[in-house]
């Protein structure tokens, strides 16, 4: 795997941090540290024990990712037409649980692609930096778009998740990573 693919892998593992950022109102510094720590730790553990669990994870990790992103897309589209209050991460326990749940894909990617990663230190550094960056982008983008149109935020977010999920499924079906 070339250095460019290692970089893309690291960034793609952390894109879901955007979700946490858009859901948090307070404790953003704590959230940024938590999201970075969870992604790096779970990715590193996945890389280290990938040989033991790789055969179990690699057969269905793309399907789980697709279903998760499809769920997020449908949830965003539901919020587009609904006037219900949006789920907020407003306490430490919710932040930690959501951060951990959304970091599990880092574990699966680390476990299933450990032999293709040639620049492990670089990948870990990029994950440590990009997870809080995407989280902060979600936080700031949500605040800016709500000022103008929260409906546009839901539509954009849903479409983004649908594209990512579809690409993951297409990649799996076509035999790619």
What kind of feature is each model-predicted range?
Residues 6-26, 83, 94-117:
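Generic transmembrane alpha-helix signature in multi-pass membrane proteins
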Residues 1-15, 59-68, 120-133:
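Structural signature of hydrophobic alpha-helical transmembrane segments
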Residues 12, 43, 47, 68-78, ...:
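Alpha-helical transmembrane segments of multi-pass membrane proteins
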Residues 27-38, 88-96, 150-159:
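Cytoplasmic-side transmembrane-helix entry/capping segments in multi-pass membrane proteins
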Residues 44-51, 104-115, 162-177:
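Hydrophobic alpha-helical transmembrane segments in multi-pass integral membrane proteins
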Residues 28-55, 116-148:
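A small-residue-rich subset of transmembrane alpha-helices
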Residues 17-29, 73-86, 135-150:
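C-terminal ends of transmembrane helices
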Residues 55-82, 149-177:
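Selective transmembrane alpha-helices of multi-pass membrane proteins
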């Amino acid at each position: 795997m070339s250095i460019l693919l290692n970089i893309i892998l690291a960034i793609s593992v952390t894109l879901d941090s955007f979700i946490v950022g858009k859901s948090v109102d307070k404790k953003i510094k704590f959230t940024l540290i938590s999201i970075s720590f969870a992604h790096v730790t779970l990715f590193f553990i996945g890389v280290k024990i990938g040989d033991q669990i790789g055969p179990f994870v690699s057969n269905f990790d793309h399907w789980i990712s697709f279903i998760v992103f499809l769920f997020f897309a449908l949830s965003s589209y539901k919020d587009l037409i609904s006037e219900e209050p949006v789920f907020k991460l407003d306490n430490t326990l919710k932040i930690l649980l959501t951060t951990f749940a959304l970091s599990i894909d880092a574990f699966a990617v680390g476990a299933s692609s450990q032999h293709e990663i040639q620049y492990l230190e670089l990948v870990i550094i990029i994950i440590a930096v990009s997870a809080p960056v995407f989280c902060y982008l979600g936080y700031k983008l949500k605040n800016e778009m709500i000022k103008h149109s929260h409906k546009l935020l839901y539509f954009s977010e849903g479409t983004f998740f649908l594209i990512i999920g579809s690409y993951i499924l297409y990649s799996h079906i076509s035999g790619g990573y």
